[in-house]
């Protein structure tokens, strides 16, 4: 009988299916890894926007984590939207009793319109309780600014931001350069800072509005590859290659920013 690596996503639910838990489980399935989930909040959203965010109780979040702990052998996991300080503290405390393997944190903190999704208390909890325990952080540029106060716009400022993140206990990070008005050239750069290497992943930009869930999908692809035995550097590089293929092959669903086309990478995994 074939054994499938087991992974976990701790994140919010997207009723539109393009981001959050739904995007994570689709990415896991594409890789042939078995995805489990802990839902932190329910969102009412579609391709045109988020219409409501409803955090779950800390009791329900804790119960989900412990249920996964008691029955599954998790090889790697990711965290996405954690909603508020209470849920962040709950997750941090519960994880101290778990062995879920390597952790990828996609710090969902800033909305597309630039509004902060986490209050200051929650950001402080995230910095103190979760950043030092994370094996890989995958922030976009607005999230880098929220965490460090540094506007990362080029190699020098990205390196400066990483210095601040390292002071906060971050070991490895992918600073994603595609989520900003400042980069509208032919290529988009992601800055990768690992404990033993630093490099840039550059990919051609594509003219598409169907990019909802790119951050969730990238972190989930990395988790799936880690669970299959790749090291961090190769998992990040391969995930970026796959995400580029996905964006090249848009999925026209809904009337706004459509979801990603995970079917497009079936033959590449």
Curated annotation (Swiss-Prot):
Gene3D superfamilies: 3.40.1190.20. It is an enzyme of class 2 (transferase). Pfam families: Phos_pyr_kin. The keyword Kinase applies. One of its GO terms (biological process) is thiamine diphosphate biosynthetic process. It catalyses: 4-amino-5-hydroxymethyl-2-methylpyrimidine + ATP = 4-amino-2-methyl-5-(phosphooxymethyl)pyrimidine + ADP + H(+); 4-amino-2-methyl-5-(phosphooxymethyl)pyrimidine + ATP = 4-amino-2-methyl-5-(diphosphooxymethyl)pyrimidine + ADP. Keywords: ATP-binding, Kinase, Nucleotide-binding, Thiamine biosynthesis, Transferase. GO terms for cellular component: cytosol. Pathway: Cofactor biosynthesis; thiamine diphosphate biosynthesis; 4-amino-2-methyl-5-diphosphomethylpyrimidine from 5-amino-1-(5-phospho-D-ribosyl)imidazole: step 2/3; Cofactor biosynthesis; thiamine diphosphate biosynthesis; 4-amino-2-methyl-5-diphosphomethylpyrimidine from 5-amino-1-(5-phospho-D-ribosyl)imidazole: step 3/3. NCBIfam families: HMP-P_kinase. 4-amino-5-hydroxymethyl-2-methylpyrimidine binds at residue 45. Belongs to the ThiD family. This is Hydroxymethylpyrimidine/phosphomethylpyrimidine kinase. It comes from the Bacteria. Catalyzes the phosphorylation of hydroxymethylpyrimidine phosphate (HMP-P) to HMP-PP, and of HMP to HMP-P. GO terms for molecular function: ATP binding; hydroxymethylpyrimidine kinase activity; phosphomethylpyrimidine kinase activity. Its EC number is 2.7.1.49, 2.7.4.7. The keyword Cell inner membrane does not apply.
